């Protein structure tokens, strides 16, 4: 693990001594990205519904109060929030279930795993808090960790890798939202073609120019991850950093560039990545994956 003076990030008891501090860190990671969704919903809500809610906000009617709350979050905000929440809950469930089953390789060595896969985890957190922290830190792209991701089970390690590759499960402050809007534009365009209507999103027509930019924006993220991963495993400078000769070695490389592209910062440690090649390649991926989508999305906004 990387980070902080001791190099243990949120696993060190000096920074994160109890479950309470762990929960505070989790909440701190989630509040800004979720707030961005609420702000978007507020900005995109129906003016007519807002007017009705404002006229009834001072009454004692529960129905009117509920209506005001719905308008405050906005229909678009609710839809995006629910979609992201479903992906988050599924990932959390899979990670916790896989980690609670334990590591079969450790079990075959004769070690009893009544607490689940505790390799690389802090005893004070256990499997539950570690799985939650792992899911949150890779969903909200903060990069902080309270356990060793490299020691996760195969399915447990798939969840953070998937969340960073999708980069739409809440994401960083505004990043997950802007990527989800690209998926929304593509979905609206496809649905419009299926029913024979001109695609529109938030009252704006979606045409060929916007779709080309949206498709380019979607392709950038996997292209950078897979392209640089292929480069790393094809040249000596990259191969020399892989310490696991099996499939997990390839997973370490994919995770490294997925984490860089998602601006996360966590990693499957064991990869000898403090070299010129890894530092330069990860820096390039980090720069391109962050600014190219922003530039393209500004282009989409300007053409609508």
Give, region by region, the residue ranges found by the protein language model.
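Membrane-proximal intracellular helices of multi-pass ion channels
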Residues: 1-304
């Amino acid at each position: 693990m990387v980070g902080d003076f001791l190099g243990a990030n949120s696993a060190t008891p000096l920074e994160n001594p109890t479950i309470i501090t762990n929960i505070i860190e989790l909440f701190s990671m989630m509040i800004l990205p979720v707030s961005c969704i609420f702000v978007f919903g507020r900005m995109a809500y129906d003016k007519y519904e807002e007017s009705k809610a404002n006229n009834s906000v001072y009454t004692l009617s529960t129905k009117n109060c509920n209506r005001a709350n719905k308008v405050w979050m906005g229909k678009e905000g609710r839809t995006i929030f629910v979609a992201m929440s479903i992906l988050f809950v599924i990932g959390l469930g899979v990670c916790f279930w896989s980690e609670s089953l334990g590591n079969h390789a450790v079990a075959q060595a004769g070690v009893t795993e009544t607490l689940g896969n505790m390799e690389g985890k802090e005893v004070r957190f256990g499997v539950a808090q570690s799985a939650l922290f792992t899911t949150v830190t890779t969903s909200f792209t903060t990069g902080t960790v309270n356990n060793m991701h490299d020691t996760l089970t195969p399915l447990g390690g798939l969840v953070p890798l998937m969340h960073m590759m999708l980069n739409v499960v809440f994401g960083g402050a505004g990043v997950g939202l802007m990527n989800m809007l690209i998926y929304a534009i593509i979905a609206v365009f496809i649905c419009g073609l299926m029913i024979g209507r001109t695609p529109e999103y938030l009252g704006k027509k979606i045409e060929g120019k916007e779709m080309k930019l949206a498709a380019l924006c979607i392709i950038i993220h996997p292209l950078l991850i897979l392209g640089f991963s292929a480069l790393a495993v094809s040249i000596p400078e990259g191969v020399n950093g892989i310490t696991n000769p099996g499939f997990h070695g390839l997973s370490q490389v994919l995770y490294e560039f997925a984490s860089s592209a998602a601006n996360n910062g966590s990693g499957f440690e064991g990869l000898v990545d403090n070299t010129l090649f890894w530092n330069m390649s990860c820096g390039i991926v980090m720069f391109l994956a962050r600014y190219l989508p922003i530039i393209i999305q500004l282009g989409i906004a300007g053409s609508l």
